[in-house]
Curated annotation (Swiss-Prot):
Its EC number is 2.7.7.6. It comes from Streptococcus pyogenes serotype M2 (strain MGAS10270). This is DNA-directed RNA polymerase subunit beta. The gene is rpoB. Pfam families: RNA_pol_Rpb2_1, RNA_pol_Rpb2_2, RNA_pol_Rpb2_3, RNA_pol_Rpb2_45, RNA_pol_Rpb2_6, RNA_pol_Rpb2_7. Keywords: DNA-directed RNA polymerase, Nucleotidyltransferase, Transcription, Transferase. The RNAP catalytic core consists of 2 alpha, 1 beta, 1 beta' and 1 omega subunit. When a sigma factor is associated with the core the holoenzyme is formed, which can initiate transcription. CDD domains: RNA_pol_B_RPB2.
């Protein structure tokens, strides 16, 4: 027997064909959400408060300080928040201290700071009753970047940018004349020496001393001349910078100083963030810049006078490691003191080294480092600016390297916690202005923190983020996989990110650093391709937000691959050589072969085993969760694999789903971590179990109660239904499944079913990927799903009195009320069709709505009883089904309702949808198609043992698409069905073709895995043997019931009077200009005329035509289309005297629309009246006939 048995939870064993020993379990798949939010609660929120506070008033006599914060218990539980359309949030109380600096008086007070949404255990938020997800954002990391560009003459120029987390950009660039310029915050450029002079190093010699001799420095100094001898060089430079930043304002050196300090050196206005400081120090670090350069001077220990490295030595990695302590200490540190006019007058510490120019061995180049400021320094320092300039000047000398902005070492993830912290900071900054003003205005003696703090800007900022940010998304809840995928999504769009139109090809493309960090396959098709990605299965964020991936460390001394796991970011990995997970190893962990396949930076090639530093932990670390669920992924073309991964996320939960015969072993973990199942929190024993709840007695005697969700409506309108797995007496361990969620079976993800599939054509019905299906799948509810729709009706107070929910509805017969209770609300379990009343409701009618006769009667008799019109909630088009639940919310019951609403009724209708012609089906390999025919079981082709085939697919769908994985799955699936086993074939480490054929033989199938098929209609065998097997097929969310649409009479647009468009508006089909040309080409003038008039926007014409048809009279001539009248009115509104003349030059009067038609649906009502009138006339005619 090929393969080995593997247990997945307590309910499933699979035969696995994997060969690689997994040394690391998959991490919790939603930790990117939960860990980030926990960090925010533990430290992020505190940091935001400490950033903004303390706040002083303008005279600096009062100060508001932050002490601490505390979350109290949430007002609603999760379930209550869902039912009441509320948010699942906890009140946050912040303690402030108000200090009066003049009297020394201190007032401490706890202030309510609003309700803050709390993340559920599943990694989601509940906002206004709907489940939402905050998608992590992929953004360019703050730091310093260098780039090169070739001009039209082929000359290479260089550029550099310092990008902060917030604050002004500082850029450097060269021009064609070899002069270096700087730009501050995207303004006009100035010679870079001007900025150096403003920093207090004004002499030309001083500048040359710092940066060393080079053409760029000399050319720039010559360009930057002293224009105004009455000013010092520093003052002149400051004024020049001020002129660029604030053109047109009077320039003084003092105002320029304070402006520059605010732009770059004030931590409250300029923030590199921890990650920015880390990246700047890393890039400008002297050790990486000296690597492999030849030193041009003796390196001497200042304390002992010992020569550490002699001039002429190549600074290899080992030489640098030997003097690392000195490099990190005071080796070659120089202190430069700026002059008194400088922006910052503190001494500047730089580290300076001289190396031999790689281009010209006779020249010496100076390298200046920023002496590694402390991690806590979040603003820029003069040393950073000078070191950046040095690196930039060194690029022209062939030292250093330019950055690739698509490298994942330069792009980082902003997860939930950080996005929330940023939003909270915005709110606090708005509050700060408010607080300052109140402190200054009010009397100091009576002030308390509560009085000066207005929390509205903070709560508004948080609400706005959750409610309307591009990154706060309604959770994709089609099935557990789509939930999981959504939580692990990485988007480059959103505030501070890219836009679809500006994103070029490079940003979207797969980059070598995506390996093990971002999935190269799972991304949407269409305009967002490559901008929305998914985290790879083992991907993990470090404290700076860079994605790390795990590797097994190789002990270089012994050459063994250890089980020690090292997590590397993309730029750390660039320094190493990594071998693939499938490299053959001996028993002792050494490489079995001298040459192994590996990766170093962007190169995939063969390496000697002795140079390998790390080995991949698993073959599936490359791909995301959805992609890792595709068996035989390695045999599929990547475009089809992309479709396969995306379509699994659109699977509809079925009534009785089945896990795949051929899986990848990923199904268990995906179901476990998705949050859709019920998982045991502690060890214990089941003491009670039914469909609604499970009780487990823990070992310490306490009782855990788990509630099972039955048929709740998901965000996608599908049934979210859990099924209990455990029985009384079962022993349960922490992490075990207590109940399956939707699309799960026995603790494994089960998106579809395992039908018997044949690759064959049948009467042409599977042309162009269409799917032919057996009626068995309909009758036995194999592909049946339950869909829930929610409808609501509310009663409000109107000017004419309150609306009422009642059974007493005017002009409605008893038949229509048969399923309503005494209140007028539909009973649970009632079967309803389109147009049936769900909630009977009447609204008071104004006097203007009454006819003259009715008004007269009211004036005489004061009869106010029937002044109501019917505004009941009815079943909309396509909404028929069975009433599953009714929820009633009233003020009396203490429910929170919107202002003006007295009562709210929600009705849930369940539909059972069997598979039908027009539904979309798919396999896991991107092989999708639409059901074209459902054939009776007796007519389907059958196997020699009499088993009818369930589905027939077109064999032409395979070769050109190159997704051969489906054929391998088909054969292996048939073998698994015959053997009665389930199989796991993990991606890139699954069943080989030998394993496949061995299993086929073991199952007793023919050697080519094909079979003779018999025609169900004639009993004759087909001419050729056919590939028949079991393939996992899923039903997708694109169902024909949601798409089929037809209109005869419906609403019209208000201005143009043309029918509305789209199924949602019950609209018509657009007859566009090209369709008009087609009818013109055939000379079908009458058809064309009625399409452009009666059927569209000839208002009087269509009424008369309707009347004529109902009375059986000839249809009158059409009038003028309304849109023509609109055109005339628009031209007249421009002041043009536009008149319409007929063929005899007489003016045609264009009728105005009747006044008071303020409702799109008015014209439908007119048609209804015409119908009633017609019915009345017919009745009169029949009565007179009867009399005769």
């Amino acid at each position: 027997m090929a393969g080995h048995e593997v247990r997945y939870g307590k309910h499933r064993t699979r035969r696995s064909f994997s060969r690689i020993k997994e040394v690391l379990d998959l991490p919790n798949l939603i930790e990117i959400q939960t860990d980030s939010f926990q960090d925010f609660l533990d430290s992020g929120l505190k940091e935001v408060f400490e950033d903004v506070l303390p706040i002083s008033n303008f005279t600096d006599t009062m100060e508001l300080e932050f002490v601490g914060y505390e979350f109290k218990e949430p007002k609603y539980t999760l379930e209550e928040a869902r039912i009441h359309d509320a948010s699942y949030s906890a009140p946050i109380f912040v303690t402030f201290r108000l200090v009066n600096k003049e009297t020394g008086e201190i007032k401490t007070q706890e202030v309510f700071f609003g309700d803050f949404p709390i993340m559920t255990e599943m990694g989601t938020f509940i906002i206004n009753g709907g489940e939402r997800i905050i998608v992590s954002q992929l953004v360019r990391s703050p730091g310093v970047y260098f780039n090169d560009k070739v001009d039209k003459n082929g000359k290479v120029g260089y550029g550099s940018t310092v990008i902060p987390n917030r604050g002004a950009w500082l850029e450097l660039e060269t021009d064609s004349k070899d002069i270096a310029y700087t730009r501050i915050d995207r303004t006009r450029k100035i010679p870079f020496t001007t900025l150096v002079r403003a920093l207090g190093f004004s002499g030309d010699d001083e500048i040359v001393d710092i940066f060393g001799e080079s053409d760029l420095v000399r050319n720039t100094i010559e360009k930057d001349i002293h224009k105004n001898p009455s000013d010092s060089r520093t003052d002149e430079a400051l004024k020049e910078i001020y002129e660029r930043l604030r053109p047109g304002e009077p320039k003084t050196a003092d105002s320029s100083r304070s402006l520059l300090i605010a732009r770059f050196f004030d931590a409250r206005r300029y923030d590199l963030a921890a990650v920015g400081r880390y990246k700047v120090n890393k890039k400008l670090n002297i050790k990486t810049r000296l690597l492999n350069q030849i030193i041009a001077e003796n390196l001497v220990d200042a304390e002992t006078g010992e020569i550490l490295v002699e001039a002429g030595t190549e600074m290899t990695r080992s030489v640098i490691e030997s003097i690392e302590e000195h490099l990190d200490g005071d080796l070659n540190k120089f202190v430069y003191t700026p002059n008194d006019y400088a922006v910052v007058t503190e001494p500047v510490v730089l580290q300076k080294f001289k190396v031999v120019s790689p281009i010209d061995p006779d020249r010496v180049v100076t390298i200046v480092g920023n002496a590694n400021p402390d991690d806590k320094v979040r603003a820029l320092t003069p040393a950073d600016i000078l070191a950046e300039m040095s690196y930039f000047l060194n690029l022209a000398e062939g030292l250093g390297k330019v950055d690739d902005i698509d490298h994942l070492g330069n792009r980082r993830i902003r997860a939930v916690g950080e996005l929330l912290a940023n939003q909270f900071r915005i709110g606090l900054a708005r509050m700060e202005r408010n607080v300052r003003e109140r402190m200054s205005v009010q009397d100091n003696d009576v002030l308390t923190p509560q009085q000066i703090i207005n929390i509205r800007p903070v709560t508004a900022a948080v609400k706005e983020f959750f409610g309307s940010s591009q990154l706060s998304q309604f959770m994709d809840q089609h099935n557990p996989l789509s939930e999981l995928s959504h939580k692990r999504r990485l988007s480059a769009l959103g505030p501070g990110g890219l836009t679809r139109d500006r994103a070029g090809y490079e940003v979207r493309d797969v980059h070598y650093t995506h390996y093990g960090r971002m999935c190269p396959i799972e991304t949407p098709e269409g305009p967002n391709i490559g901008l929305i990605n998914n985290l790879s299965s083992f991907g993990h964020l470090n404290k700076y937000g860079f994605i790390q991936t795990p590797y097994r460390k190789v002990d270089r001394a012994t050459g063994t691959v250890t089980n020690e796991i090292v997590w590397l970011t993309a730029d750390e990995e660039d320094e190493y050589t990594v071998a693939q997970a499938n490299s053959k190893l001996n028993e002792d962990g050494t490489f079995a072969e001298e040459i192994v396949m590996g990766r170093h930076q962007g190169n995939n090639q063969e390496f000697s085993a002795s140079v390998v530093d790390f080995v991949d932990v698993s073959p599936k670390q490359v791909v995301a969760v959805a992609t890792a669920c595709i068996p035989f992924l390695e045999n599929d073309d990547s475009n089809r694999a992309l479709m396969g991964a995306n379509m699994q996320r659109q699977a509809v939960p079925l009534i009785d789903p089945k896990a795949p015969y051929v899986g990848t072993g990923m199904e268990y973990q995906a179901a476990h971590d998705s949050g859709a199942a019920v998982i045991a929190q502690h060890n214990g024993k089941v003491v009670f179990s039914d469909a609604e709840k499970v009780e487990i007695r823990r070992q310490d005697g306490s009782l855990d109660v788990y509630h099972i969700t039955k048929f709740r409506r998901s965000n996608s309108g599908t049934a979210y239904n859990q099924r209990t797995l455990v029985k009384v007496g079962d022993i349960v361990e922490k992490g075990d499944f207590i109940a399956d969620g939707p699309s799960m079976e026995n603790g494994e993800m089960a998106l579809g079913q395992n039908p018997v599939v044949a690759y064959m054509t049948w009467e042409g019905y599977n042309f162009e990927d269409a799917v032919i299906m057996s009626e068995r799948l309909v009758k036995e509810d194999v592909y049946t799903s339950v869909h829930l729709e929610e409808f609501e009706s509310e009663t409000r107070d109107t000017k004419l009195g309150p609306e009422e929910i009642t059974r007493e509805i005017p002009n409605v017969g008893e038949e229509a009320l048969k399923d309503l209770d005494e209140m007028g609300i539909i009973r649970i379990g009632a079967e309803v069709k389109e147009g049936d009343i769900l909630v009977g409701k009447v609204t008071p009618k104004g006097e203007k709505d009454l006819s003259a006769e009715e008004r007269l009667l009211h004036a005489i008799f004061g009869d106010k009883s029937r002044e109501v019109r019917d505004t009941s909630l009815r079943v909309p088009h396509g909404g028929d089904g069975i009433v599953r639940d009714v929820k009633i919310f009233t003020r009396a019951n203490g429910d929170e309702l919107q202002s003006g609403v007295n009562m709210l009724v929600r009705v849930y209708i369940a539909q059972k949808r069997k598979i039908k012609v027009g539904d979309k089906m798919a396999g896991r390999h991107g092989n999708k198609g639409v059901v074209s025919r459902i054939v009776p079981v007796e007519d389907m082709p059958y196997l020699p043992d009499g088993t009818p085939v369930d589905i027939m697919l077109n064999p032409l769908g395979v070769p050109s698409r190159m997704n051969i994985g489906q054929v391998m799955e088909l054969h292996l699936g048939m073998a698994a069905r015959n053997l009665g086993i389930h199989i796991a074939t993990p991606v890139f480490d699954g069943a080989s073709s030998e394993d496949l054929w061995d299993t086929v033989r073991e199952a007793g199938m023919d050697s080519d895995a094909k079979t003779v098929l018999y025609d169900g209609r004639t009993g004759e065998p087909f001419d050729n043997r056919v590939s028949v097997g079991v393939m996992y097929m899923i039903k997708l969310h694109h169902m024909v019931d949601d798409k089929l649409h037809a209109r005869s009479v419906g609403p019209y647009s208000l201005v143009t009077q043309q029918p509305l468009g789209g199924k949602a508006q019950f609209g018509g089909q657009r007859f566009g200009e090209m369709e008009v040309w087609a009818l013109e080409a055939y000379g079908a003038s009458n058809v064309l005329q009625e399409i452009l008039t009666y059927k569209s926007d000839d208002v009087t014409g269509r009424l008369k035509a309707y009347e004529a048809i109902t009375k059986g009279k000839p249809i009158p001539k059409p009038g003028v289309p309304e849109s023509f009248r609109v055109l005339v009115k628009e031209l007249q509104s421009l002041g043009l005297d536009m008149r319409v003349l007929d063929e005899d030059d007489n003016e045609v009067e264009l009728r105005d629309l009747d006044e008071g038609e303020d409702d799109d649906i008015m014209h439908v009502d007119d048609l209804e009246k015409a119908r009633e009138k017609q019915a009345q006339e017919t009745q009169e005619v029949s009565e007179t006939t009867d009399e005769k």
